[in-house]
Every structure is written in C-alpha cells, then in structure tokens.
Design a protein with these regions (language model features):
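Active-site anion-handling motifs in enzyme catalytic cores
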Residues: 1-196
Length: 196
C-alpha cells in the first residue's frame, strides 16, 4: 500500500467542479502532505491499470460536486462493473445532491438506482466517515438508509488561512440570505422573506 489517495473528480465542463478539485488538492497538501494525490476522471470506467493504482492506495475518494443523483453509478462515477474489484475504502468528500426543485420534502424519498445504492452501501461500510456539502444531501442519504456520513460543506468553501485557527466571533449586525434559483419558483419562500 502506497502513501497516496486516488480522487475521482467530475471536472469536465463545470467550473465549480474544477474549483472543488483545485481546493481539495490544496487541502490535502496542507493537511496530508504525506499523501500523494492521483486524480482520475470519474466519468471514465476504471480499467485494469487504474484499478491497480487505486488498490495500491490508502483510499479512493469521490470528490464533491452535485454527484448524488439517481444514476450516480454509472453516469457520474463509471467505476467498474464489480465494486468488489475496488479493495480499498471508498470515501465521499463534500458531495452534494442534485434536485430540480431543491425542496426539503424531496430528501425523504430521493430515488437511487441499484448500482448507486450498492456504492453507497460500500462507502457506508468503509469504516470511515464520508462527507456531504449540505443538509439536504445528508438527509437524502440518511433516508436511503446510509448513516456513516456527516455534513462538512463543500471543499471549495474552506479558507486555508483559517484552518487550525480558533474561531473569532464578532458582533453581527447584518445577515444576508442567498435564495438561489428556487426563489423564482417558490411563492412561499418569497412570502417568508418579505415578511421577515
């Protein structure tokens, strides 16, 4: 086993995915300088050579982005036809869900195909906690029966200048809310924001 991690990333045509990969590599460099990082495209099926590299590593890490979708396997992560070919722990880092409506109620019955559920079961049983980028994703995963996950936020959110420093709370006089695109189609959200 080599002192390395393999990360599967989705940086193909989304600027946010490139940012996530870039920041994750910086975080690994800062926090695990003893580990080499090998980056493999998540959408490409793993061949014998890539599997050998992965199985010589400490872990396979599935990096961020809106990867949790019904057919995450094979659409986002092609992986291999047999998950048992991957001998090392598989861990998710800062992964998010993808929902057209983005409503909390959607997290209670978030659909996943059999291959995606099998991958999440393997991740859940890895012996390591995996991370998601928001509470909607965490709830969707938990309602699908997977509990070894925690909400850490997106790797891109982490400011390296403040890692390992004590939180300095200052008096807050103003709070800003970003409603995202859901605001456009949600009269109830608009009403709540105007009333409060």
């Amino acid at each position: 086993m080599k002192d390395q991690y393999v990360i599967l990333t989705g940086s193909k045509n989304n600027a946010g995915d490139y940012l996530i990969k870039y920041r994750a590599k910086q975080l690994f460099s800062d926090l695990r300088p003893d580990r080499k990082i090998i980056d493999i495209n998540g959408w490409e099926q793993l061949n014998t050579e890539k599997l050998a590299i992965i199985n010589q590593s400490k872990a396979l890490i599935l990096m961020g982005g809106p990867a949790l979708i019904k057919n995450m396997v094979p659409k986002v992560y092609a992986l291999t036809n047999n998950l048992e070919d991957i001998k090392v722990p598989i861990i998710m880092m800062g992964t998010g869900w993808k929902s057209q409506r983005g409503n909390w109620e959607d997290t209670y019955s978030y659909p996943l195909n059999v291959k995606t559920s099998s991958l999440l079961k393997k991740i859940d049983n890895s012996g390591y906690q995996s991370s998601v980028r928001d509470y909607h994703t965490l709830n969707a995963i938990r309602f699908n029966g997977f509990n070894n996950f925690l909400m850490t936020g997106c790797p891109a959110y982490y400011d390296r200048d403040f890692i390992k420093t004590e939180l300095q709370l200052k008096e807050v006089n103003k709070v800003a809310f970003s409603l995202g695109v859901a605001f456009i189609e949600s009269p109830s959200m608009e009403k709540l924001m105007k009333e409060n």
